[in-house]
Amino acid sequence: MGGKEASRGFLYQGFASVLEALTDKNKWDKIYIEFPTSNDKVDIALGAANKVIKSIQVKSTINTFSKSDIMVWLRDLIADIDAPEYELCLIGQCEKSAITFKNSIEKFYNNTLDNTAVKSLDGFSTDLLRNKRINFVILPFEIEVLEKIVRDSLHKYISYSNQMLSFDQISFIASATVNDQMISSTHGDGIDRKKFDEELEKRIFLIADKYSPKRISIAVTSFPRGAVHLEDKTMCLSLVDKFDGRNLKSGY
């Protein structure tokens, strides 16, 4: 893998890990990037009570994912680590046969196998599917679209804290969070859910408190020409002072 492709894959892992952290919050208490295993097949791992509860591999391609590749990746991922749940995060487009294979696995779990599914699963041991769950997440290859998906997930997260942030503010927090996840992969220790939430909430409240516009209500009262002692009836606000140094449109 070349330098450009490696950097892009590293970035995609950051996006995928943030999405996992934001959308799968009810299960994990620790998230790992580049989780160490004997065959290095686990890109992201979710942990709970010192056990891996979800093992994730992230793949990306500018071309298309084939069924044969997906079968190999699943076998290797399952063989590399024992977990109750596995996930292939595919960033890019899938061939028709790959989509059929993905749907066939879902039919296997739902006990709704038909002739198409049986044919698609031929050559792949369904014993690998028993007593565990295999999921697929398919995301677009375009970084701009991934950024939007992360922003939307973060927006939903922020809404639970009753904060109102602008598009630019959410984008800033999203980028910083992805960057944090990428840096954490170099440490190998993982990130506690408590710390993840605390750091994210700290950013949210800091941005909301320091950089959110504040609305101030101003009441305007009119008086007839020649009225005196206005100060007894209201408090006068000098707009000249407020707009000092600013250019106003002619006629105002």
PLM-predicted stretches and their roles:
Residues 1-6, 60-252:
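Acidic metal-coordinating catalytic centers involved in nucleic-acid phosphodiester chemistry
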Residues 6-7, 11-75:
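Catalytic centers of nucleases
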